[in-house]
Every structure is written in C-alpha cells, then in structure tokens.
Amino acid sequence: MKHKIIIINGPNLNLLGEREKEKYGNFSLKDVENDCLNFSKKNDMEVSFYQSNVEGELINFIQDSRDNFNGLIINAGGYTHTSVAIHDALKILKIPIIELHISNIYNR
C-alpha cells in the first residue's frame, strides 16, 4: 500500500526565502515541497501540500483530510502557540501526525 501524506504549512510560510533569512534560510516553500516530492518518490509515498494564512481554512482542510491520508505533517507557524482550534482539529484525526518547525521555537 502506498502511503499518502499531507504536508500543511500555516501563516507566512508562503514567504519562505523572502523573510527573516537569518532565521529561516534562503529556501522557498516550493524548494521544500520539491525536496519532499523527491523523497516521497524514492520511498514509494504520495505527498500533497496545503498552505494557508487563514486559521479557519487550515481547520477546514484538516477536517476534510481526515479520511484521505495515512499521515499528516504540519508546520502551523505562529498558530502553533495560539490556536486551540487547530489543536482540536488535529485531535479528531486517527492518523499519525508530526508537528515540525523550520527554526528552533525554544530559541525565540
């Protein structure tokens, strides 16, 4: 069975490579997506991407994804620290979830 993974990125991650390069580097979100696609092809996985700056859109997408994927990876950006609603939407899912960040959130 081919694993289907969704990678979700939250607010301002669409501007990777343009903002705070000293913190986030020079790579764009498209660069990250291309790296993920290359990895997924080598490992017989199917990967999809979603990005939004809007909390409600992220929640709707998470809820709508609950039966379509075998795993979810999320970088919720600033919502990591503030959104109980996104946290609650993720708790609904019955698939593995990985939360990740580009920078060390404990050094802020």
What are these regions (language model features)?
Residues 1-6:
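Extreme N-terminal starter segment of soluble prokaryotic enzymes
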Residues 65-72:
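Short acidic/histidine-rich motifs immediately flanking catalytic phosphotransfer sites
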Residues 16-30:
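Glycine- and acidic-residue-enriched helix-capping/strand-helix junction motifs
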Residues 57-61:
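Short acidic active-site motifs
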Residues 46-56:
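Short beta->alpha junction loops
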Residues 32-47:
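A short, N-terminal amphipathic alpha-helix
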Residues 79-108:
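Flexible, gly/pro- and Lys/Arg-enriched active-site loops
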